[in-house]
Amino acid sequence: MSTGVVLFAPPEAPNYVDAIVEQAREAAAAGLRSAWFGQRFDYDSPGLAAIVGREVPQLRVGSSAIPIFGRHPLLVSSQAQTTQAATHGRYDLGLALGAPAFMEATFGLPYDRPIGLLREFLTVVRSLVETGSADFHGERLSTTTLMSAKVPGAEPTVPVLVAAMGPQALRVTGELADGTIPYLAGPKTLDEHIVPTITSAAQKAGRPAPRVVTLLPVVVTSDVDRVRENAERQLAMYDQLPSYHRVVGLEGKDRAAELAVIGDEETVAAAIRRYRAAGATEIVATETDLGGPADQRRTWRLLGELAND
C-alpha cells in the first residue's frame, strides 16, 4: 500500500519552501511514497508541489485540497498541468468544496449550490487537462478557450481527486473524477458509506475503480496520553464544521480527535491495515508532529515500512 504524509513547515521556519523541501527529503529517506500539501491562504499548493517534486524525485506529490470557490477551472488547470510537467508526471490534483464559513468570509462569495458548482468545475477542468480546450457555459461557470490550454510535458493526464465525503459529492466525484480524498473518515465509514457510493457512481459512468486516498492523523509514540491531549486541541476546530461532524458521527464517535491513530508501532500498523481492508487505496498521514520531532521520525519510519507491506 502506498503511504504518504501531509507536510507543513513550523511557523518559526525562516523560509517556508526551504523547510518543506528538507522535510520532503526526510520523508523520502524514511521510505514514504508521497508528499501532500493543503491549500491555505498563504503558500500556493501546486507551486509548492512542483518545487518538492523537482527537488525530491523519489516522491509523488499532491494538493489536498484546493477549494473550488473563488477559483476558475482554467487557472487551476494551468497550475496543475505546470506542476505535472515539472514533476514529470508525479502530481495529483485534489479539489475541495471547502467549509462555508471560510469560503464566504475569505472570498466574499455566497456558498450556494455547491454540488452544482462541483459538477461544472469537474466537467471543465477534466476537459482542460485531457484535451487542452473547453467550451462550456453552465449556470455557475463559463469558459471558451481561444487558444490551446495544454502544457507540453504534462503527461500523463493529471489525476483529479476530490475531498468528497457526503453522498451527493461522492456521486459526482465517482462520475467525473479519479477518486476521493476523505479526511477523518474511519474504517466503518469508508466501508459502509464512502467506498460503495463512489464506486457505484464510477461503475455507472463507465469509469475505472476510484482511488480512495485516505487522510488521517497518525502518531507513533510511547506517550499516548500527551499526544491524545495535543490531538484534542489540534483537531477541535473540525468538531464545529458540519461536514466533519457528520463523518465523525458515522464512525460512532463524538469528536474528531477520536479518529486520530495514536500508539506504538503495532497499534498503529494494525489500525492502518483496517483502513486498507475497508477500501483505502492509499494512506496519507496528517498531524504527524503532534508528539514532537522524535515521534514524527518514528511515525515516518513505520509508514515507510508499511509502504512495502
What is the predicted role of each segment?
Residues 1-309:
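Active-site-adjacent structural elements that line small-molecule/cofactor binding pockets in enzymes
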